[in-house]
Structures are given as structure tokens and as C-alpha cells.
Amino acid sequence: MDDSKHILITKILKNEVTEALGCTEVGLIGYAVSLCNISDPFSIDKLELTLNNGSFKNAYAVGVPNTGKYGILPAVVGGLLGNSKNKLLIFNDITYSQELEDFIKEKLEIKVIDGPLFCNIKIKDNSGNYFESLIKDNHLNVVIPKIEKEKIDVEITTSEKGEYKNLELIDFLDYLDEIPEKIGKLVEKTVQTNKNLIKGDFLNYGTDILSIIVNKTTSACNTRMTGENMPAMSVAKSGNMGIMATLPIISYDSSTENNSEKLIKSVLLSMLVTIYSTYNSSYLSSMCGCVSKGGMGAVIGLCYYKNGKNLKKLDSSARTFTANLPGIICDGGKVGCALKLASGCFAAYSSLFVDISYENGIVGKDFKECVENISKISKAMGDLDCDIVEIMSKKM
């Protein structure tokens, strides 16, 4: 394939496939808090947290690793106890303090705004000192304080995202023929890390292939949403999207051929499609991205595993998936996400066996048009977030 396309895809993958501990948004909050570098948390007089509505939703009711607790408050406390060098793994090795939680609870003020990813921390201590941090647009884009970028950090520009959006499915397929060694190892790490999240049964329907796919995928999601101290490999800044994009294919492989080469290529293709779907819409939205974006990745990855480089069948699977689940709302990260992933698994697997025609609803002519149509609906659902957040806020 064209060298410039190959370089672009490799750079995108290095940026968008990363390790995260706990729901990405509680990690975002914890990381932002830690950047304020408060030496004595008990000196805090006021702590103001401003989140965009999507980040608020995803942090509101999800488990926070190493705390045994759920939601925004323990994420803030965990951030005060963590090391900013850990970034989205901020809750690694913290020793949680109930005393500090009780103290911070009286100092914390939460504000929710509309718009893209935004996490702003403002702290005033009892000596009148002010501290601030700001992360916006993506989970690792630290605007305040100014920090020196590490060499391993890969900055993706707006124009590069635009170039990626202009790629065709055949470009992703061609990339699979020339996988760089580092990317191959990244995919292997992703497969193993996300497999490790499978702990027991969440939805154990039986022993057929679909039931195994559903059970393993939902088990991994439940492990993450309950705040187990186990990392997930996120795709497009979402751990659950990473789970949805990988576990159905991993489960299908283990139930059928156990073919490591096909597994790596299929999972990689799924991740490329998930990122592509995200760039066509947004990182966070009113539509469940795990189903609509990670699900589309799983569909294409499964179809590739089963049928190889067959564009006709890949387009067919994309059409069938588009006729099914897009439109499910995102009401935040929580244990219930596992049920949405179960629906996504069914839709992805069934898309291998049915061909829904272009004339149906929002179904596109091919993969690319299907993604564009789903993205258009996702963007049109934007106003729903205000109502979803209003309903959730009443529970605080």
C-alpha cells in the first residue's frame, strides 16, 4: 500500500490503542486531579470540578479501581492519592482513605457543561493558594499545567484525523498484509490484556458459539465496570469499546479455529474500524459508542475472520449491523453496559448470516456509507445528553 497511508495508520494505532485502569473517564478525573500536585489534600478549602456531559455520564456510576467505590467522588480522592506519571493508570497502587473522602465530600463542587471532552480542576487551599489543571479534546491532552511531552507520546493532528477518515476499507485490509512488528506486538498485548478481564460468568446462556461470545465479552465488561484492579486496552480512548472490538473475535477464534494469525489480523482490523467510526462521529456522544463503533469494528473483524478479504461480504455485514442496533443511548459507564455489549455481540454475530439490503432505513450501500449514516444520527442525538444528565443528576 501507499507508504504515507501505512505511516498514518501506524501512527493512529499507537495513539488510539492504550492501556487504561478502570473506566476511562474516572481515570481522566483522577489524572486531572493529580496534575494539581497537592502535597497535603487536607489543606484543600475548595475543589471545583467541571466536566463535559459525556465525561460526567461515564464517571457517574462506574467502579473506581483500588477504592471499592463507585463514581466521581472516589475518582477525585484517588487522584489526590495517585501519581500523575501514571496518567490513565492513576489508581495504580493507591491506598484509599475514607477519612480523605469524608473531608473532600464537603469541599467538592461539580459542574457539567455541554461540548466535547473537558475536565477542569480548580483547587483553593486554606492558605489562599490556587491550583488548576485542564484536559480537553482527548484524555491525554493536558492544556494546564504545561508539561513536557514525553517522546513516547504521539500527537495526532486534526488534519491527520481527517486523512484517516478519508481512507477506504480496502486501505485497512491492505495494511493487514504489512503489519509492523511493533503493531503486531501491540495487538498481541491487547488480546492478552482484554482476555485477562474474563472472570467467571455474567450471562451464561449455554455452550454454542454466540453464547460463548456474549458470556466472555460481558464478563470482561463487568470486571471493568465494577472497578477491578485490572487494566483494559482501550480503543479510541474507551476501554469498553476496546472490549467490544476485541472479545467477540477472541471468543470466536477460541471456539473455532484457534488461528493466531487470523486472530491478530481480525482484531487489528476491528480496532482500525472502531477508530474510523469514532473519527466520523466523536469520542463521546448520546449514542452508545461501544455498540455503534466498537460493534461495527467487531462486525468487520468477525466477517474478515470468517470470509477473508471479501469486500462484498464485509459490506453486507456492515449493512446488516446498521439495520439493527445504532441508536441505543449512552447513559454513562456502569455495570449495565455489559447488557448493551451483549446486544452488540448478538447484532455483530447475526450480521454474518443475513444480508439486509440498502433500501432498509438508514442502511448504506457499503461499509463507508453505513458508518457515515450512523455518525450522522449520532451527531443529531446530541441534545439528548442534557436530558440524560438531568435525569442522572437527580440521583446525586
Swiss-Prot record:
Its EC number is 4.4.1.28. It holds the Pfam family SDH_alpha. It comes from the Archaea. The keyword DNA-binding does not apply. The active site is at C23. InterPro entries: Ser_deHydtase-like_asu, UPF0597. Its cofactor is [4Fe-4S] cluster. Binds 1 [4Fe-4S] cluster per subunit. GO terms for molecular function: 4 iron, 4 sulfur cluster binding; L-cysteine desulfhydrase activity; metal ion binding. The keyword Nucleotidyltransferase does not apply. Keywords: 4Fe-4S, Iron, Iron-sulfur, Lyase, Metal-binding. GO terms for biological process: L-cysteine catabolic process to pyruvate. It catalyses: L-cysteine + H2O = hydrogen sulfide + pyruvate + NH4(+) + H(+). [4Fe-4S] cluster binds at C288, C330, C337. It is an enzyme of class 4 (lyase). Catalyzes the cleavage of L-cysteine to form 2-aminoprop-2-enoate and sulfide. The former then spontaneously hydrolyzes to pyruvate and NH(3). May be responsible for the production of sulfide required for the biosynthesis of iron-sulfur centers in this archaea. Belongs to the L-cysteine desulfidase family. Homotrimer. This is L-cysteine desulfidase. It comes from Methanococcus maripaludis (strain C6 / ATCC BAA-1332).
